[in-house]
Structures are given as C-alpha cells and as structure tokens.
C-alpha cells in the first residue's frame, strides 16, 4: 500500500491496454458469481478466488492450507494464494473483448472528445459505432473522401462501382480505432495553429476547441486510440459485493448484473466468430456488446437505461461516483467515524462555559478502551478481555476509573447543520445521570440550538495531538467572537437578559430610598432583610468598591441601586462602575453627577436624578465586547458564566408571569378604525369618479390601513407600563418585539394573498379580542408561506455555502508578507444617501499601504504597513479622512493563498492571523451562514416610476457570486466626461443619453421607463451607471479594470447583507471575489507555448511570460475573465476537488485526456486521499513536531496483540 502522507501529487491518465493487463490478476471468462449450493465462488467467474484472492483470511478455497504460517503459498489443489481476504478489495481482473468497444465517456461527453480528435460530428460517430453506417478508412485510388460516411446501401453501390478491395470502409468501434491510430498529432496541431491565424467566427471557435484536445493528447502522452477498449478491467469483488439476506436470498451490487451482460455477450460473440456466422448476426452481437459496455460504464447516458426488477435503472460505474450518494461525497469527503454518539440535548445551566454534560452510559461506551487500559494497569482484571467483561457487566469499580479517564480529555460536540466553524466546539465532559447531553446555554447561539428536541453528536479526539488541538483551538470558552464580523457571539439571551434587566431597574420612592451603606456587603444584608428593594436608589461609599475612580470621585458617596451594586460586583476589576446603560459610562467612566460629598442631603439629591433605564440585551453585548477588548478570552468567559448565573437567579426571583390582563386595551381603537374606514370610502369614491387609477386606489387603501396600524402602535407605546411583564420582555430584548405586541393589543393589519399581493381587507381584530373565522382564514396563508419559505431558503442557502466553500477551499494564509506594490483605496460604502458600511468599520483590523496624514495639520496618523486598530480607525475618521489606501486580498501577490499583511486580523480571535489559517473556508462559511436570514423575495421598487424588479436577498447574492446578468440591468457609460444631453424619443419609447469626453462621445439608448441616475451637466467616470439598477459585472470588466469590478462586487454583496442587518467583514467577501477573477484567457500566445483561447490561472500566465521575456521573446497577451463560483470551482487546477463538486464524469474525462496532475494544494483533495490537510498544524512547517506527553502513559496495544495471538494458538491446539 502507498503511504498516504508520503506522496506529493496524484495523476490521472487514460489506461493503455498493457496497463490494464498489468493490473489484472486473471481473466474473468464466465458470468457466474457463486455456486448456489456450496455458496463458494465459481471458477473463472466474477468472484473467482484464484483471480481475486481468498474469501477467508489465510485460508485457501479447498481448505488444504489454513492459518497464517502458510502465508504466500499458492495451493496446489485449488490454485488460491493464502493471504488476507482484504486483497479482494484491491485485486482486479479483466475481460478480453472479442471486438473493440468505444468508451462512452469519450464519445458521448460534451464536447465529444472522439469527435474533436477526428473532426467528425458526434452524430456520424454514433452511426458508425452502433453499426448504422460505414466510414471510409482508406479511399486508396477512388474519389471517395477520407472519413466520409455511407449507409449500407451506398456502401454496396460503391463496391459495385469501384470493385472489391478498391477502398477500405468499416463500421463499429473498430473503424473508429483505425481512424484514431491514423491521427498524426504534431501535424494536426501545426495545421490548426496556421488556420487560427486567419479563421474567425464559428470556424475559429471550433479550431480552438480541437487544438485544445489534440494538444492535451500530445502533451500528456496519451494515445487517442486508447479511447477505444480492447480489454475491459473488472473491479475487485468486494467493491461490488454479494451478501446473503435472512431469507436465504442474495442481494448483489448492480455492477455484477452489468458485468454479466458484458461477459454473456462477449462469449456469444466469440462463439459466433468461431462458427464464421453471417456478417449481419456478428454485427448485431457486436452492437449489443457495445451497448452492454456502455451500460456498465454509464447506464442511461445513451438510449434507455438497462433496468433491474421493478424497472429501476441499474447503477453503473459512473453512478458510483456521482452525486451526494456517490463515492466522492459519501465515502471520501465525509466518513462515519467510531468513538462517536448522538443524543437529545438538554440545558445545563450549572455548567461552566468549557463544560458539557455527558450521560454515564454514553461516556463508558465512548471511553471504553481508555477505561480498559486503566483497569488492566491497576490489576483489577488480568487481561483486556476480562476488562471488557467487567465494563459490560457494569461493575461498580469502573465508574471511578471513568471519572479519572475523562478528566482533562476534551470531547467535540457538533450540531447539524454545521453552517460555520462554531458548529463544532470542544468541551470538557462532566458525567451526569439521564440520557440527554447537557449543553451550556450561552453556546446555543453559536450552534443555533434550542432545547425543543434538538440532537447533537459527540466525538472523542483520540491522539495526544488531537486532544491538544481540541483544548487549545476549539474549547468553547475560546470562541467568544463570531468569525464573520468579529462581534461577540455569546451574548446572554432570554432569561439571562431578563434577570439582568430586572436587576438593574430603578424605581423612585421604593422602601429605604436614600439609605447610605459603608460597603456592598452591608447593602446586600439590608436587601436580604427587607429594608431596601433591588430597585431602591441608595448611596454607597466609593472607597469600598474596587473600581477605577477619577480623582474627584474618590472618598465620595455614590448614588446607585442595590441591584446595580450586585450587577457591578461580578464585573472584572478595572472596568468602570456601570451606572448608565451607555457607551460613555463603559469606556470613559461613571458620570460625575452621581457622586456626593459624605454628609450631603442624599435624599434630595436622589429625588432630582432622572430614572435610568435598565441594561438591555444590546448593552450586555457592548459590555462583553469591551471586556473582551480589554481582558481577552479567559476573563470574558468567566464573566459570561457569572452573568448567566446572575441572570437566571434574578429572573427566577423576579417571578414574571403573563396573563391576559397584561395585554392592555387601547381606548380609542374604535375611533381610529372608524376614521380609516371613512378615508377608504373617500378613496373609493375618487376612484369611481375616475379621479385616480386602480393602482393608485390600491396603494392609497393599503397605505391608509398601514397608517391606522401605526397609530395604534404609537398609542400602545405611549400607554405601556414599564413594569408590564410583556413590555419588560420586549424592552429588554429577551423575547418578542413591538410588532408582536401590537398584534396582541392593537390590530393584526394587512395580510398577503397567495399570489404575494397584499390584500386590501385588513384584519382589524387583535389576539386579545380574538379573530373572526374569516380573519383567521386570511391569516393562515401568510403563516404557511412563512414555513415554506424558510424550508426552501435553508436548502438554497446550504447550496450557496457549498459552492462558496468549494471555490475558496484552497485559500490559506501561506506567508507573512507578499511584498505587493499595490493597494486598495477604500471609503465608506453608501447607496444614494443611505450609509451601508462606514469607513471606520472597513478600516478596523487591516494594514495600511500608504501613510495616512491629517488632512488639515499634515501630522502622520499612521505609517505604511501598520495595523489599524479600533482606536486608530476612529482617529482617522474623526480627522476627516475620507479615503485610505489599505493592503487588501484583492492586491495580494501570494500564490495559492493570501499573506498575513494583506488579510489583516483574524476576526475570530481579534489577533493577527496565523500562517496556515484556512481563510477561504472561513470566508465561505461567514457568507453562507447568514444566508438563511436573508429574504427570498424579489421586491418591486414601488410606484409606477420603474418597470424593473430589483432582486434582493438570497437570490441577489447568488446572482452576484454566479456573475449572472442581473435583473433590471443599469446602462453604463464607456466614456469619461460630461452628460451633455438627454433626449426622449416618443416614437420608439426610449431616451438617449449623450456623454462627451476628451477621448470621444458616447450615445446610450435607455428604456423610457428606466429611472435616470444622472442629469445634464453631471460628470461621469468610465463604467458609471446612467440609470438605476445593477451593473452587469462582465460588462464593467470590459469597460474598466479588474480592481473596479472587485470593488463593485464587494459593495454589492455588502448592500444585500447590511440591508438585512447582517454584518460581514469585507475581507471574507474579498477572498471570494478574488477567486472569481483568478483566470485569464490567452488572446495572443506571442512566443510562449500557450494556446490561443486557453483559460488559465493568472499566476501561471505571469510565469510563462516571465520565462519568455528573460529569453528575449515576445510575451503573450490575455484578457481577465470573470467566472461565477460554480464555474470557477470546476475550472480549479485540482481535478479531485472539481470532480467531487459537480459534473464528476465530465471533469474526470477531461482530466484523464490531459493526464492532469493534482498537486494536492487545497483542503478537499487531501481529505479525499486521506492525507492530513495543509492548513493549520498540517502545514509543512509544523509537520515534524513531536508531541510530548506531560505524564508518560504505558501503551498496551502490543500486549493486547500478544494476548490475542496466544488465545488464538490455544484455540488451535484444543481443536
């Protein structure tokens, strides 16, 4: 066997007949499988032990040789070699075909490789291969054309005309094989290159295609005639198994049936040839053999598929590779693993952030080998077998050992769907009773888990390296930030928010108001004994609290509440005392107005203070972000645990309940609705009189009901009591929002009809009053549509993520600095007047390219190649700088990846990114994971002013990444200059826009209904949009340069996500967009070996040019190509990655002809062949590190093997 971690690359080529023979261990001559009585494989059949090896380890077929000591001997009676039965997975056989057979992949694929090689149409090829026509192989002296096609009748006529033997014409694959042998590759290639110099149009396209295929054959050393098979390999029997079912029947792989048909037809053909049967019968048999081989290779590719019982198409070799159930995606990219389990999850509120609860029964099964080793080491049992029996009996002594074994041994928890890297995290297991896994409530948000029956899988990392990685890199307490935007992902939610909200509320005039305490303990004691309430405003000596007071705040009395004293007690030292829920208090310290000199009239001072709002979910998020910024991970996760405990405790104490009386009644609801009814009546009257159109009437009516709903909502907000439990839940951010509340207390409002149009009849009732039957019926449609949309969106979003991962999986941080001389100019992203992404956010965590100076004073704010921190970013923006040149992924020169400086910080950790970080995969997950939050709809831009639907939400993201022509496309200018005129042409219903520049004039025809973005006198740049709508990126690439397209795509993706309130770091989108523009198309090869029209990687193109320029030749020219992510994935240099993505057969066909070599640079290729992936600790620079165990553990694998061998020998003797 090949050592997986040793080889550097993998190549795929066409197999020559001699190669197939060298693989084979013998010829399969009979279609039989196994003998129905003895159940032993038949001789010369598809399961023959002589060819494929023994069915039992170390035992020949007849039983003469048994046991390992006869290893390598071939039995003289039955001819079977004594070896492991595992060889039946590796040894191949072959079938000697009695007639050449065409390989369907090369004849039927698009484009047909055989057709291009021979310059014949696929239709003509099909007629020849399936014996419907003759092809001229050698016209000799006749006027017949070489490779011309003729029917049977024409053939006979020509024979009569020119005489027998005057020319050679044949049919079937044999004819094609002869033609392929005649192809002189160097000569054909030279002729095509000549032709390309003058050809144009269709002719040119065809020549480029032919040249591509012929050049591939020539360079790879494959011979074209190998596309025709003379010998057919038979795959090992264990890869097409036959198993006995309970009822004594057999279930066999479909491949056996397909092979049987081939062998039957091949044998029949051999017999017919021996008997010198009539030509027509032989021809028919050859055609049937061709069809049988076609079905074996790719059933259903041509004609009707061969079916099995119940007219189910049989699964051929191609189907074994294709699709989600195929070899690539089912067995190579994802395998089922041992040391794993799954169970329902339940909440573990008492756990620490790095812990999870594992049921005892599950743990003993998962850690069985570890426990067994310990049992043997402690001499509780003599050997491994006895230890196993102890565990199976459930001996009491095993539980203590299990406790010790799992200590410090992390486990991984995973919840499907794993949308981003936070879907798998490591925890320290804690043994619990029951059968459900316990999960820490704060990690739920990262997993998107809840406790309504969700299940999770658990995995045990075995090796010391794996345990170390799980503990250091994957521990849940380390994952505070979300990789997509660098914001905390573990903000408290629901009860925790509610508890802290209740705790930090303030009340005027509560019992004990104005009491002064010497320290926190005294305040808590007073609260416990009922002298003060949590919400009571009291005073406390500042010196007793360990907080960073300003000088004027020391030795004072501070006015606060008992709840806030408790809330601040859990905060880390060094954080200001949090009195107001705002950022100023958090970053700059407690405001001075809360401090008094000791002995002042505190009651009067308190009475003058306004009531502060409590801390809401958003405020807690800000506090966590600030603490992470100051104290990093460990302190943050400890604080989160304290916040969680405090929140749960006080939400329990608060005892919030919800009853129907908590839903207020709006006193003037009837009046508001009555007014709206009158207004609607007036609108209808106007319509009946013909004063407004039907569309205007519809818009006015729906607007009227919307405003009625808003009035009720406004009234609700005015009336709401801050102590109302529903209001508290809503205001704190624990659950629900104003729209839920207004449906409970106001009115439900307008609903959408099944066709998506909003119905004019609103639902006037709310849930407190109850809906009428008709209203209920109206509202069901919206509810169902919501469920359906969610389901469809999830699938769409998952597929988008898969394509994104595929295109960027080989983007890894490869070096420290690429030394590029280019940078990216960035400014705020805006849409009209609306701010999409401010400059400050875009600058954070990036490196500068040029020095940034203060625009007024000229002082240097930051030099080149330096990291822009949050504070520096704020300083740059405050100085009034509008544009900064930064290092960007777009301009990075690193091959097969990105350098650290162009990428910036790793958003998941807040630190500089490490070499080896798989930033491509992180980028793909960051863009794909929020996909489910985007809408599915394509919106109308409203009103009559526009006829274009602007695509938004998920469909727009797909449109951008697939580089499709957008709906509602904008017209762009190719000239830089001034708009000199806009003329309307009523006859053609169009407008004409005239742009005049230094280089020339442009005239652009715009649809009449399109909304103009420019006016006469405006200055426009090249590629600027003249009308509203999305620019077609491929068109922009023609007019402008690559960087302009990249910048445009980046801002377009941000617009979609930001409009839905989803924040994504620019760098993730940069990584994806860069992958879409990696290729160039060669326009003129110059003196290089490149072929015209070839698509190639930009780095390979530059290398080829560099070589030629050094030698003093003319370099090639090329044009950048923008590819959608699906196409870019399929065009990757790695055929393994492309084949496992989509269109498996097409990718493999192409790779084989080209003799492609996969250098295993990406992650996917390495996963497929089972090699350690070249990212993180798998990179070459980290590969040879030896793990050092802290305490030496005795490894007892050898003893186990010795024991088992001894037992086996003992059994042999007793037999």
UniProtKB/Swiss-Prot annotation:
Binding site for Zn(2+) 2: 818, 892, 899, 902
Keyword Transferase appears in the UniProt entry: yes
Family matches, as InterPro entries: DNA-dir_RpoC_beta_prime, DNA-dir_RpoC_beta_prime_bact, RNA_pol_asu, RNA_pol_N, RNA_pol_Rpb1_1, RNA_pol_Rpb1_3, RNA_pol_Rpb1_3_sf, RNA_pol_Rpb1_4
Pfam families: RNA_pol_Rpb1_1 (PF04997), RNA_pol_Rpb1_2 (PF00623), RNA_pol_Rpb1_3 (PF04983), RNA_pol_Rpb1_4 (PF05000), RNA_pol_Rpb1_5 (PF04998)
Cofactor binding note from Swiss-Prot or TrEMBL: Binds 1 Mg(2+) ion per subunit.
Keywords: DNA-directed RNA polymerase, Magnesium, Metal-binding, Nucleotidyltransferase, Transcription, Transferase, Zinc
Residues annotated as binding Mg(2+): 450, 452, 454
E.C. number: 2.7.7.6
One Gene Ontology term from the biological process aspect of the record: DNA-templated transcription
CDD domains hit by this protein: RNAP_beta'_C, RNAP_beta'_N
GO molecular function, one term: DNA-directed RNA polymerase activity
Binding, Zn(2+) 1: 60, 62, 75, 78
Oligomeric and partner information: The RNAP catalytic core consists of 2 alpha, 1 beta, 1 beta' and 1 omega subunit. When a sigma factor is associated with the core the holoenzyme is formed, which can initiate transcription.
Family: Belongs to the RNA polymerase beta' chain family.
Function summary: DNA-dependent RNA polymerase catalyzes the transcription of DNA into RNA using the four ribonucleoside triphosphates as substrates.
Family matches, as PANTHER family: DNA-DIRECTED RNA POLYMERASE, DNA-DIRECTED RNA POLYMERASE SUBUNIT BETA
Record-given protein name: DNA-directed RNA polymerase subunit beta'
Gene: rpoC
């Amino acid at each position: 066997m090949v050592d997986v971690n040793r080889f550097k690359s993998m190549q795929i080529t066409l197999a020559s007949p001699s190669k197939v023979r060298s693989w084979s261990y013998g010829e399969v001559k009979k279609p039989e499988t196994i003998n129905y009585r003895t159940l032993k494989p038949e001789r010369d059949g598809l399961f023959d032990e002589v060819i494929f090896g023994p069915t039992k380890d170390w035992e020949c077929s007849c039983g003469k040789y048994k046991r390992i000591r006869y290893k390598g001997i071939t039995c003289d009676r039955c001819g079977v070699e004594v070896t492991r039965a595992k060889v039946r997975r590796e040894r191949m056989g072959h079938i000697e075909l009695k007639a050449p057979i065409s390989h369907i992949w090369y004849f039927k694929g698009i484009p047909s490789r055989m057709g291009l090689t021979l310059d014949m149409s696929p239709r003509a090829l099909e007629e020849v291969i399936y014996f419907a026509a003759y092809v001229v192989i050698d016209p000799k002296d006749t006027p017949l054309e070489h490779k011309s096609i003729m029917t049977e009748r024409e053939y006979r006529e020509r024979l009569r005309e020119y005489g027998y033997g005057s020319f050679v014409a044949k049919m079937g694959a044999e004819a094609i094989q002869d033609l392929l042998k005649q192809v002189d590759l160097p000569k054909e290639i030279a002729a095509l290159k000549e032709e390309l110099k003058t050809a144009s149009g269709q002719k040119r396209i065809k020549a480029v295609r032919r040249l591509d295929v012929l050049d591939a054959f020539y360079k790879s050393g494959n011979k074209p005639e190998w596309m025709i098979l003379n010998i057919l390999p038979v795959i090992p029997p264990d890869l097409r198994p036959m198993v006995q079912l309970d009822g004594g029947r057999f279930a066999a792989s479909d491949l056996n049936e397909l092979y049987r048909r081939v062998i039957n037809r091949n044998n029949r053909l051999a017999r017919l040839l021996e008997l010198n049967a009539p030509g027509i019968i032989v021809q028919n048999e050859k055609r049937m053999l061709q069809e049988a081989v076609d079905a074996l290779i790719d059933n259903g590719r041509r004609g009707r598929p061969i079916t099995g019982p119940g007219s189910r198409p049989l699964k051929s070799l191609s189907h074994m590779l294709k699709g989600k159930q195929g070899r690539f995606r089912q067995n190579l990219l994802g395998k089922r693993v041992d040391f794993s389990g799954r169970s329902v999850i339940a909440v573990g509120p008492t756990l620490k952030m790095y812990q999870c609860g594992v049921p005892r029964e599950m743990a003993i099964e998962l850690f069985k080998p570890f426990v067994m080793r310990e049992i043997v080491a402690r001499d509780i049992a003599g050997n491994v077998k006895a230890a196993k029996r102890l565990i199976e009996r459930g001996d009491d002594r095993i539980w203590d050992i299990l406790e010790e074994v799992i200590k410090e041994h992390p486990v991984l928890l995973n919840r499907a769907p794993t949308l981003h890297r936070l879907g798998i995290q490591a925890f320290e297991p804690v043994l619990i009773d029951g059968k459900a896994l316990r999960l820490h409530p704060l990690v739920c948000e990262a997993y998107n888990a809840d406790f309504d029956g969700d299940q999770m899988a658990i995995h045990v990392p075995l090796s010391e390296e794996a345990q170390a990685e799980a503990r250091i890199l994957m521990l849940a307490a380390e994952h505070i930030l979300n990789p997509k935007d660098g914001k905390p992902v573990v903000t408290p939610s629901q009860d925790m928010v509610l508890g802290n909200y209740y705790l930090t509320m303030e009340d005027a005039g509560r019992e004990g108001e104005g009491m002064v305490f010497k320290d926190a303990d005294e305040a808590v004691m007073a609260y416990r004994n009922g002298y003060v309430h949590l919400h009571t405003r009291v005073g406390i000596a500042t010196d007793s609290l360990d907080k960073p007071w300003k000088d004027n705040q020391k030795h004072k009395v501070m006015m606060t509440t008992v709840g806030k004293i408790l809330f601040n007690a859990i905060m880390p030292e060094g954080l200001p005392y949090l009195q107001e829920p705002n950022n100023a208090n958090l970053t700059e310290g407690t405001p001075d107005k809360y401090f008094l000199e000791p002995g002042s009239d505190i009651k009067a001072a308190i009475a003058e203070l306004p009531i502060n709002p409590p801390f809401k979910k958003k405020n807690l998020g800000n506090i966590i972000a600030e603490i992470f910024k100051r104290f990093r991970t460990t302190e943050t996760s400890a604080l989160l645990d304290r916040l969680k405990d405090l929140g749960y405790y006080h939400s329990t104490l608060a005892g919030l309940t919800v009853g129907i009386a908590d839903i207020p009644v709006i006193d003037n609801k009837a009046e508001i609705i009555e007014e709206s009814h009158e207004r609607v009546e007036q609108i209808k009257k106007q319509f009946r009189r013909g004063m407004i159109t039907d569309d205007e009437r519809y818009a006015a009516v729906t607007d009227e009901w919307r405003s009625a709903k808003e009035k009720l909502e406004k009234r609700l907000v005015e009336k709401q009591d801050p102590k109302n439990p529903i209001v508290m839940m809503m205001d704190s951010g624990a659950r629900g929002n104003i729209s839920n509340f207004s449906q409970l207390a106001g009115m439900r409002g307008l609903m959408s009809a099944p066709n998506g149009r909003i119905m004019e009849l609103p639902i006037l009732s709310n849930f407190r009053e109850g809906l009428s039957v008709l209203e209920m019926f109206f509202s069901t449609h919206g509810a169902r549509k919501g469920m359906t949309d969610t389901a469809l969106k999830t699938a769409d979003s998952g597929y988008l993520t898969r394509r994104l991962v595929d295109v960027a999986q080989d983007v890894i941080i490869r070096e420290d600095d690429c030394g590029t001389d280019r940078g990216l100019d960035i400014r705020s992203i805006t849409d009209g007047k609306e701010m999409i992404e401010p400059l400050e956010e875009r600058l954070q965590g990036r490196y500068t390219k040029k020095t940034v100076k203060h625009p007024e004073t000229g002082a240097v704010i930051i030099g080149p190649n330096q990291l822009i921190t949050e504070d520096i970013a704020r300083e740059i923006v405050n100085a009034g700088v509008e544009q900064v040149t930064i290092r960007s992924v777009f301009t990075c020169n690193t091959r097969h990846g990105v350098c650290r400086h162009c990428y910036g910080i790793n958003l998941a950790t807040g630190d500089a990114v490490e070499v080896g970080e798989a930033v491509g995969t992180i980028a793909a997950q960051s863009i794909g994971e929020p996909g489910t939050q985007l809408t599915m709809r394509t919106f109308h831009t409203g009103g009559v002013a526009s006829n274009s639907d602007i695509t938004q939400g998920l469909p727009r993201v797909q449109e951008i990444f697939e580089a499709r022509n957008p709906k509602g496309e904008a017209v762009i200018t190719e000239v830089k200059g001034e708009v000199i005129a806009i003329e309307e042409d009523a006859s053609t219903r169009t407008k004409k826009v005239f742009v005049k520049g230094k280089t020339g004039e442009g005239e652009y025809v715009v649809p009449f209904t399109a909304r103009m973005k420019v006016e006469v006198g405006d200055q426009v740049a090249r590629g600027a949009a003249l009308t509203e709508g999305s620019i077609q990126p491929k068109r922009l690439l023609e007019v402008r340069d690559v960087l302009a397209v990249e910048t445009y795509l980046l801002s377009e993706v941000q617009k979609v996500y930001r409009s839905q309130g989803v924040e994504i770091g620019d760098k993730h989108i940069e990584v994806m967009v860069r992958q879409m523009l990696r290729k160039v198309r060669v326009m003129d090869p110059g003196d290089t070996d490149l072929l015209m029209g070839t698509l190639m990687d930009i780095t390979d193109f530059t290398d080829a040019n560099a070589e030629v320029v050094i030698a003093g030749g003319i370099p090639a020219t090329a044009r950048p190509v923008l590819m959608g992510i699906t196409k870019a994935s399929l065009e990757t240099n790695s055929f393994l990655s492309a084949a496992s993505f989509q269109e498996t057969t097409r990718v493999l066909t192409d790779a084989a002809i080209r003799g492609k070599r996969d250098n295993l640079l990406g992650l996917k290729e390495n996963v497929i062949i089972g090699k350690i992936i070249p990212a993180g600790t798998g990179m070459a620079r980290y590969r040879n590190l030896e793990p050092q165990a802290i305490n030496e553990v005795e490894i007892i694998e050898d003893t186990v093997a010795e024991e088992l061998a001894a037992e086996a020998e003992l059994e042999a003797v007793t037999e």
